[in-house]
Amino acid sequence: MKNESPQHFIRPSSPVDPAVVRVLRPLDPIARAADCAYFVAGATARDLILVNVHGLRPGRATRDIDFGIAVESWDQFALLKERLVATGDFASDRRALQRLIYSDQATGISIPIDLIPFRGITSADSTIEWPPSRDIVMNVAGFEEALASSVSVEMGGDLTVRVASLPGLTLLKLVAWSDRSRETNKDAADLHRLLTSYADAGNTDRLYEREMDLLQAFDFDMELAGAELLGRDVASVCSPGALDQIRSLVKSERELERLTNQMIQSSAYPEAAAAVARMVNAFCRGILKDS
């Protein structure tokens, strides 16, 4: 899954939030001029793919927009931020080194923009240490894979951007859940949404035409088949190191039980605990296939 996906288009019936487009219009050419490959991540990527491309229902609302930014040095990252601030539309946030605040002139609303750098500044343990003190450490495991497996989405006009694919986004969510699951359930809730939506997000024909074994294994339950297919696809976009990391995670009964419980707690139908557990097991089976 190395950028082989066809170009995606926004459904006229599910237009993108205009504020998102207004953020992307100045950011895209500035990132290109600074030679910074980037992709849209987080909840914005989720909604672009699930809602705006495939027409599925909106998920958990959020106003911030996340980006993964590939840079070779901290100087290159600083230059990108300086050029964005110089437009007058973005301002630095002293409380968070990765954050800019976009002032939406059309609405008067301020939108947090998180720019997560990786690549040349990433340590062997997949972390980055923010200068100058280097005492703020951030885990960027999965970002290389998310960029490599990102998909192209035409936003309208002459604007086309890279967006984290659903497998890439799921990988990032697994890493985030592993890091902060004792502080918040939101990553588990997002993972549950991805698992339950994958079949309907452009994979129905694929399941019937190329993955009939999955449909038969789950008695033609599309959600369960989609969950295992997502697990397989996540494994396919992983580097060997990332794959070892997530396979170790899903092999832990204690961690899986905690993930399942958090999904149940965040579900609109907590009484469906058994169904959630089956979906998590199907997803994990996909990740562990051929291991």
Enumerate the language-model features and the residues they cover.
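Compositionally biased terminal segments of proteins
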Residues: 1-291
